[in-house]
Amino acid sequence: MTTRREFLKTGLAGGLLLNLAACARPLENGGRTVVLNALIPVMLTGALPADGNARPELIARTRSGVERAIAGLAPATQKEIGELFDLLAFPPTRMLAAGIWSPWPEATPAAIGNFLESWRHSRFDLLKSGYAALHDLIFGAWYARPDTW
């Protein structure tokens, strides 16, 4: 049985870890570029061309669309999305919450797919909401362009 002291220690440690993640935020957009470069090809499997010169450009345009979509959200929602990307970009929380042990550029499509499926079907609503946010941002940015229809 967890004691009150253990509960408080765990809460403080978790809060400290999240604050460290915010302080360690990369200079660019909170690590979103690196995370999105890894997630977009996995989430858009079947829609993106498998190979070819167009693939990197389509990923970059989708990432740009995600950034535009985030910029159009309410400030409170932008903050929550920023916290989601902080969680995924900061190595200790990425490892614990997503189970991705290698840096995003080195993560395999299978590992990323497993992470996404685990969040999609999680028993925790917070993880399901995180998956839904990633899904909606990426698919919204992809299908907002007429050339993807």
For the regions a protein language model found, what residue spans apply to each?
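Flexible, low-complexity segments enriched for small/polar residues
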Residues: 31-141
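Short, functional C-terminal segments
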Residues: 144-149
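Ser/Thr/Pro/Gly-rich low-complexity linker/stalk segments immediately outside membranes or between
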Residues: 26-29
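N-terminal secretory signal peptides and thylakoid transit peptides that target proteins
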Residues: 1-18
